[in-house]
Swiss-Prot record:
It comes from Lawsonia intracellularis (strain PHE/MN1-00). This is Large ribosomal subunit protein uL16. One of its GO terms (biological process) is translation. The lineage of its organism: Bacteria, Pseudomonadati, Thermodesulfobacteriota, Desulfovibrionia, Desulfovibrionales. The gene is rplP. Keywords: Ribonucleoprotein, Ribosomal protein, RNA-binding, rRNA-binding, tRNA-binding. SUPFAM superfamilies: Ribosomal protein L16p/L10e. One of its GO terms (molecular function) is structural constituent of ribosome.
Length: 137
């Protein structure tokens, strides 16, 4: 699963997602992409599950690019623990996502096959998404 090698702080504040995405909003590598239409946080497990669903559908052809990286730590307190006594320990990583952010790109396969693969990946994600095609000049 995806995780950063080194971070400046072990625990971060949750923060808040506001407004549309300003970067990562255009297709850079592939021909067809999956774009987020709402705010949310994708965990590394969700990102990996969507990748596996796509790869199983397109088999050996084509290339897939993951355009988000989980670099925000998620903390949790143990079960049956009273509140207080500090912040919980890190349990995983997530990628904050804003509307308009490109999540995955595919190239090298039939558009219909790629579209079906992206639909399968979208079912694994907690945010609403749309499929977009690269504009030809």
């Amino acid at each position: 699963m995806l995780a950063p090698k080194k971070v400046k702080f072990r625990k971060w504040q949750k923060g808040r997602l506001r407004g549309p995405a300003l970067r990562g909003i255009s297709i850079a590598y592939g021909d067809i992409a999956l774009k987020s239409t709402e705010h949310g946080k994708l965990t590394s497990q969700q990102i990996e599950a969507a990748r596996i669903a796509m790869m199983r559908h397109i088999k050996r052809g084509g290339k897939v690019w993951i355009r988000v990286f989980p670099d925000h730590p998620i903390t949790a307190k143990p079960l049956e623990t009273r509140q207080g006594s500090g912040k919980g320990s890190p349990v995983g990583w997530c990628a904050p996502v804003k509307p308009g952010r490109i999540l995955y790109e595919i190239k090298g396969v039939n558009i219909d096959l790629a579209r079906e693969a992206l639909i399968r990946a979208a079912h694994k994600l907690p945010v609403k998404t749309v499929i977009v095609l690269k504009e030809r000049l």
